Amino acid sequence: MRDDSFWMREAIKLAEEGMKEYSELPISTILVANDKEIGRGVTANVREGGVIAHGELNVLLAAKRQVFSCERPLVLYTTLEPCIMCLGAAIECGVDKIVYAMPALPDGGACYADRMRGIKEKIPEIVGGVLETEEYLLMKKFIETHNETNPAWYYVNQLVREYEASLK
């Protein structure tokens, strides 16, 4: 059985490909059911011209027929802490566990999971910090290789600044 680091490493590779190929935010998601990959999603906000084409939503939408009937556990590996929208989608799809690399200090949704206990029948286990440094370095690389003309640049710059401040 592969561990969380294995799947997160795959997600980070996918995020780097999306960044290089499409100038997208370096955020991606891999959906795993009982240690078998059932989907991959990359953030596509630049390509889609919007702000809700998140990797988590993309992979859950693509695998929608499988998520309710697949073997368990169903684990969502994402390179950045999910926002509240993506957390809600994961809960509604019955994800058992969410694993993320880097915290999204300005808008991360993991803190809302505990607030939802008692409201929703099933809340996924949430594990953060898996290969956190690798994702942080990828975010820094995005800032260095892109500029303010990329709409995602400001968000990534804020993520990195707040992350660095949290380390002090």
Annotate each PLM feature:
Residues M19-S23:
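Short loop/turn motifs at secondary-structure junctions and domain boundaries
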Residues I38-N45:
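Short beta->alpha transition motifs characteristic of CBS
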Residues P26-D35:
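Short beta-strand scaffold segments in enzyme catalytic cores
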Residues M1-G18, A89-K168:
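Zinc-dependent deaminase
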Residues C83-C86:
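Short cysteine clusters
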Residues R47-N58:
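A short, polar/charged loop-to-alpha-helix boundary motif
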Residues S69-L80:
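Immediate flanking context of iron-sulfur cluster ligation sites
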